[in-house]
Structure formats: structure tokens, C-alpha cells
From Swiss-Prot:
Enzyme class, broadest EC rank: transferase
Species of origin: Dictyostelium discoideum (Social amoeba)
Protein EC: 2.7.11.1
Protein name: Serine/threonine-protein kinase 4 homolog B
Region (Disordered): 348-396, 411-482, 495-541
Amino acid sequence: MEESGQLSDFKLPEGIKDPSLEFDLIECLGRGSFGSVYKATYKKTGNIVAVKLVPINEDFQEILKEINIMKQCKSKYVVQYYGNYFKDETCWIIMEYCAFGSVSDMMNITNRVLNEEQIALVCYSTLKGLYYLHRNSKIHRDIKPGNILVSEEGECKLADFGVSGQLSERTRKRNTVIGTPFFLAPEVIQEVGYDNKADIWALGISAIEMAEFHPPYHDLHPMRVLFMIPTSTSPTLKEPHKWSPEFSDFIALCLAKEQSQRPSAKDLLKHSFFEKKLKGSYVMKSLSETAQMVIERCGGREEAVKAAAERKSKQSGVSVDFIHCESVDEPDSSDEEDLLERNNKRLSTQIQQKKEQQAQQQQQQAQQQQQQQQQQQQQYQPPSPNNNNRTTTKNNDINELDSLLNNMMMSSSASASTSPSPSSISSNGNKSGTTTNDYHTGNGRTSSSSPQFGLQHQNSSNSFPSSPNTVPSVESKPRQPASELDDLLEEMMNPSFGNRARNSSGGGGGLTPIGSPITKRPTPTMQSSTTTTTSSSSLPLPMSPSVYLSPTRVSGIWSGESAGGCANTTLWRKNPQYLLQITATTTIRITLRQTGDKLVHIGFYFARSNTGANDQFRRRITLTKEYLVPGLDITFLKSTEVSAKITMEPGYYVIIPATFEPNQEGSFELDVTATSDNIGGQYNSNNNIKLSEIKGDRDWRIISDRFEWRGSSAGGSFSGSSATWKDNPKFFFETTQTSNTTIVLGKLSDIPKETYIGFYIFKADKNCPFISLTANNLYSKTSFVNGIEVVHTQQQMPPGCYIIVPCTYDSRQEGSFTLTCYSDCQQGSIYKLDLSEQILTVHGEWRGATSGGCLNHTTWRNNAQYLIHNTSSSPTKVTIMLEQLEKMDNQQLPFVGFYVAKSPTPNLDKKLFSLTPKDIVGNTEFINDYQVHFTSIMEPNTSYIIIPSTFTPGIEYPFNLRVITNQHNVIQISRLPEWSTRKLSGEWRGQSCGGRYSNTSSSWTLNPRFRFNLPRGGRFTIILAQAEKPSYNGIGFYYFKTLQDGTLREFVCKSGFICGKEIVLESSINEGVTGVVIPSTFEPNIQDSFNLTIYSEFDLDFYNN
């Protein structure tokens, strides 16, 4: 099974006894569920290989399957297998070494998405590998960027055959659900049978991940993804205008919902996407070089991957625009061929020529630099010492410093002009106008790198670089400045110095980056508590030709709840917010200035106001890319003031001043100043702007508090593996008019980052709200995400009653959360529900003898029974719910239901052992769902008996039984006491088939006898059941008192004779009794088997006589 193409001729000898003596393990490349992979050197030849160390355990069969598949594969597009050896309890698998790891690792390490040329290379190589596998009747079943490895030459190869499958001629389709959830094809999830077209679907999803950094539905819980893939339309690129039509068409073909409509790997290799975009393996060079630099700075691949994972977790739930890799320059060639292998051969010659040219250029440059240094040494004349001329010496020093600084600035400016600016990376244009993007820090100014909102993370220490030619920053110990001059030189040389990320833990990750410069605070010259206008002389001198008019200024404070911090936390909405009205196109400068005693990191958000005539005067409660004004740098600086200049179109906007950390109290001033710039023939004027604080009297009606999922209230979700979600905290929300409502669920620091959260909104009955928590009443729901908050906006929400149920996805995930509701309905109300008076809940389980099954089985009497008593003097509506708590070991839920029977007396204190159709009020269906319920009207002073049951005996499961009513404290529920029980088996055979009692025959005395003693008397029930058969014999029994020698004395009781499955007799006795039970057939000589069961209120003796 070999493929033409150049393969490595490296081979290992057979019979290596101790692989640890033959291979040197250099570094760990990664760790997985089956083992670890190391970079290693084969000592005898020096060849670099990859060694996978796998423990020999119960999962080792899967590894043997992977080895078997790798042994059979001989293709340059599949990672080569060299051999495997055993040492102690570990298997050493020797494989081809791919220097740059997986495509996924390269993306995570560099924090970059791939460009189209790179995606084309990966997809083409993957299709070549799949064509080889599919031609040999193999399915990979786990195609994803994490299983596509990149060699040092930029070649891409398929790896990880742990879940691959072999297709035989007899089974051309498989039915096993296996693989990574986000990449599974619809037919794999639906288990309708699939073939190698499932790999094509996974390749389409992989292409989207390489373009957008995440696969579709990445922010949803994996179980939710398994539902979305078969039922939703095929995924597409989020921003198709950024990509070529050929790329979009390639993805559409790969993601055809019907597997029969997906092209084969062979057909896709001919797609026009590769004709236009496939260049050569050299296109991976920029990405691999950047990855290698990061790996070296981190101290190894494993550390680099850990740092990338930590950065990725901090970005979870935050919208980020990831940097694209550099575009690929078209090679100069008139005879360029269009296939990968031929391109690589042609380019190898070009690369060698370029290396020789670079070496010559470097040699020439070194010679020129040496000559220049010699000339400078000859020209330099040291000044003669003159102790009497101090002024001249000082002036000379200043002149030399000015010259040095000027040269540094010119050099830095020239360097900056040759590298692409951050604005060229992002596709987000400034829709509101022109932005200068400069920040004032104190009385000086540093020119900001001005990222668009989607790229704001590039300034944080755990984020991606601001330019495609730079390497992501790796946290290191900062160099200590030798003097204040060093600080000044560093700031002058680095135009973005004012926006560098701080190295402290406070600045990592999140929506908002944080800067590091600390500037000296000037003495505040003004204090104001109202909107004022000051003279332009109090403003810092502008560094542009624009002339600033008098500012519109407001003063405010961050105090208590209003010190909400930046948007990295859920508390930012509590900061002061200001409405800015602009009536004509105007160039403005927004300045935020600290006036308190303590200097902290500050910044502000500038966003469009809410839509709608009424809502635009209210606070902004969502800060996403679509609402923020593009072009403004929102880096937080430890500075006296921060400012930005921008040209804005007429409209309403919101400014939100904030400190970086919450609970940092202090005062501030916010200035909005119009410049005198000429725009469209008209000059700016302060009359064009109006600034005012958004006050509570015109704001949203806000209800907010902190709550917990704890103990039984950590019940999980409706979509998860538990029905206990109904025990979560619940909130009743009532609106009296159609309203716009936004609900924000935020998780606090005691909840792990990986925990998914979300909430449901149910339409509710105000009088009996709990019964509304069913799928039929579900009004809306959110996705479950593992970010810091979930925001849901419901436009035009009809008046009525609703219940909000916040959830973690899985049960028993404890922690604190906040729930905040913003509504423009001024007459509404929201409060936490306490339904303890309306809901009676008992916990039970079917376990051992108490898992007796339904009424089809005589053992139903072993089930627990519950008495519900209506103490009201009027009819009462009750809803009875039976809930299964959770799935066990990922198995399907059993079929369960319950019976509702009339109680013979209101205060019954014993279980029912006999039921007739007239006794049963009703029953539910038996279904394998989390909940079944039954609703009835109970008459005054009556009681029901509830019998929860599994459909078949022997099923053990926990459950909740709930009784819900719209009247408080009128229903009582209690479990009926269990009686002592014994069960024996017997048969009528030979002489023991004596028939019934008769005065004319004594044969009945030969029937089987069972000793039944009641030392204290009391109530008892005897049940005789015959074996299952198409038609039943007539059966019955007698209970006699006996003398000490066993002689029958007198009847205690006797049953009738019926031709049915069982006969039941309930009776009682006021004194202790010693006796026997004699089961009988109606006619003699009828052979059969039977069971005899006794239930007794008190202790009993029951055994074969």
C-alpha cells in the first residue's frame, strides 16, 4: 500500500531490547489522553524522531489499532511509522518528527489565523492524504487542525489514527459515533451510517477554524453542538467578503448536508481554489518562523503551548479579531506550475539563490559599517577641559543630547514607516469619521498604535502582536532603568511605549488592555460638580494645527457601586455614563482626567447610544464591537489624563469613564472639546455638542443582586444530564406593558473559567408558577458559554409573567453569580421566588426490593407509596410531578411513571396492597424522560396515594416527587410506612396437589404448608400468585391456627378461589397467633408453581413448615 513520492529512507533495526538506551528524549512535545510525545534523537545515526510513550493498560487496544493502521500507510502526506518497542509497562512508538507540530498549535502559539495560501496548502495536503486513505478503504474520522502536522520544510501530514476505521467490502458504512464533536458530520451524529465523506465534512470545518481561529459553535457546550449540527444549516464563513469566492465555494462543497452531495477527495483536488491559491510549502515560512521564535522565548514547545492555552482561556467569551498571517508574495517565474510538489521543486532553487544573495549583502554591509566607524573615530576631537566655563560645557552636553534624541527619533520613524501599521491589518473601518488616535499622558503625548476595537488585546501581555512582523510578547522581567534619561530614551524610541501592557497580574486578558506608563500628576486647578465651560487656556497645548474651543466639562466620582472597573468584569455597567449629542459633523477631543489623590489606570469607552427614541437616553448595557465607535484606542493608562481626537457624524453617543480595576474610588473630570477644523466648508462649534449625565429618572429600571448555586440549588440545566435544574434559584419577572428587556447573568470569581452558564425564560402562571417550568412554556433561552457573562436582549417582550432560571450546564457546579435585569417597563417587578409553601418535594429512590416495577408485576407493592392529604375545606387543584434526577453512566433514562389512587380513609397509615380499577384516579404514561406529571382536582378532606414506579422491576434510580398547588399550606405529603415482608416459593406436585378444603376428602391436608407466626398480632396481607400462563387455574389459601405439635386448630381467615394471576387477602388479629398458610388449587391433581408473599405491620415468622 505504497504511494509514489519521495519518502524518508530512515529505518530502525529490529530487536531493540531497551529503547531508552537507543534514543535520547530531548523535550516533551505534547500530552494526550493515551500518553506523551517527545522529540528524540536516535543515538546511532543522529536522526531526529518523535517518540510516543503509551502506558500498557485497558486502553492499549486502541493504540495497537493505531499502530496497525500506521504500519500500512506509506505516503508523504501521512506521518511515517518507524517501529515500536516495549520497556516495562510502556510502549515506545517511533514516528516521523514534524518540527512545527500541529496547525492548531501553530495558530495558538502565534495567535494568528491562516491566510488563503496557507489554508490552500493545508487543505490540499490533507486531501492528498485522504485520497490515499480512502483509496485503501480507510476513514480517518478525526480530521482537524490539531491532527495535521507541519514539517520543518512546511509540508503538512495527517497524524493521530487512534479513532480511524477500516471499511470492508461487506460494510461500506460505519455507525460508530467517534471523533471530536465540533467536526462530526451530520450522518455520524444521527448514526444513519457514514463513509469516507465524513472526513470531507471535517475538512470543511477545519478550513473555517483555520480562517476564523475557532470552529463553528465553539462557544456552545459540546452536547448542544451535537444537536445543532444535524438540525441547523451548514456553517459558512462569518465574513465571506474577506475571502475569495473560490474559498467559500470549497467550504460549501465540503459541508453539504447530504453526504452523497459531497465531492470525493479526488474530485476536490481539482477545485479552482487550489488553482488560484496553491503556491508551495514556502507559504508556511512566516507562520513557522514566528512560532519558532515564541517557542524559543518560552523555553520550549510545551511551555509555549501552555502559555497559549492560558491566553486562550483569558480570551474566552470575548470577541477578538485575530491577526492574519502575512500575504504571500508571488514568486518571480514565468513557467510557474500549479501543483504543490512541482512548486516545491522549483522554489528550492530560488530559495538557495536568495540565501547566497543575502550572504553577499550582509558581507558588504559589514564592510561599509566598519569603514564608517573608522571615519568617525578620525573625525572625533574630544573637547579640552575648562573648569572655568561651566555654562559652555552644559550647553554642549544639551546640544549633543538633542542631536542624539533627534537621530533616535528619525531612526525610529523610518523604521516604523517600513512596517505595516495595525490599521492595515484590521478590516474594521471608521464608520463614524476620521480618527487621529493619539493619547495624552500627563502633559506629554505618546503616539498610540491605535488598534481597532477587535484588536485591542494586542496591547496586553498575554495577547497577539500588533504587527504581523512581530512576535507575541512573552512575559519577562523588565529591565531596570539606569536613570530618568533611560526612561525618556525608551519612550522617545518606541512610539507605542505609552500603550505597552503591564506585566502585573492585573493586566492580563479580557476585553480591555492596560498600559504601563506612570506620569507625574499636576496640581488640579479646578473643581466642579456641575457641567461647566472653561477657557481654552486651561487646556494642554495641542500638538497639531487644530485650535480647540472651550471644553464642555462634567465632574464625577467613582464610588461604591459606581466604581465598576473596566469591561473585563460584569460590574462596568455601574460606572457613570454620559450622553453626548452631536448635531453636526464635528471634530472633537474627549479627555478624561483624574482629580483624586490616588493615581490609578483609567480609560473610557465611546459607544453609540441605544436605538429607539426613548432608549437612546438610557445607559448602554452592552459593549460589543458593533456598538463601540471604531478607531479609538481603549487602552487604560496609569496617567493623569487620557484623551483622543475623532471626527463624528451627528447622533447620540455614550461615554463611559472607568478605572481598570473595580472598587477603585476617586474623582474625575470629563471634557469634550470641539476643534476649529474646517469640515465640508463649515467650522466646528461647541454649539454642535451637548454633554449630560444619564440619571436614574430616565434610565432603565434595574434589578440586580448576587446569588449562589450551592448544594441542591446547583441543579444544572434543562439541556444537561439532570432534571434537578428546577431546584436552581428562580426569579419571577412581571411586566405590565410591552417592553424592551435585557437580562445579564454574570459568574463571579469562585466559578471556574471552564464552567458554562446560561438561563431560561418561561411563561408563567402567577398563581402556580412552578408548573410552568416545562418545555411547552419555554419562552426564550440563551446559549451556554464559558465567558464571564451571558447577555440576552428581548425586544418587544409582551406583558405577562415570566420565570428566569439561571443554570450551569452540568449539575453540582457550585459558585456565585449576579443577575441583572434592565427594562423600560416602569411598572414591572422582579424578585427571587420562594416556592417552599407551594411546592412540596420528597426525595426517594428505587433501590433493591423497593424497585418493584409497574402493576404488571406482583412486586409493585414493594415500591414506596406516598399519601397526599387535602386539608382545605374547598376543592384544590394539584399537579403531581415525578422527576428522575440524572443519567447514570451516560445510559438512557429508564421508563418511569406513577399511579394515583383514592385512599380508603383521609388519614391512611398503611400502604395499599390491593388495587382495583375503581380505586385508581389516574396514572401517567411510562416514558424515559426527566419528568412526568398529572393534574387533578382534590375534593375537600380527601387523600390520594401516589405510587412511583419503573416499568420493569429491578431498575434502581433516584427521583423527586413534587406536589404543586396554588393554595398555600393546604396540602400535606408523607411517605407511608413500610411493613415487614417475606416471600417464599412452592409448587403443587404429586400428592401435594390435594385441591381445596372439603368435608368429604382429606387430600387437601397434603397441600404445601408454610409456617406463619404473628407474635404480636396486628394487620397483615397475604398474596398468593401462580406462575405466568395463558389461562389461569382457580387458586386460594387457608390460614389456620395450630397447636404446638402442628395440628390444625381453627381458621384465622381464608380467601376465596379465583381463576386469576393472584389473590390478595387483607386481615388483622388482636392477639399473637401461631399458624400455617395452606395454598390450594380449586381442583385436585393440578400441578403448578406459586409464590406466597406476606406483609405484616409487626414482626413475623414465615418459613416452610
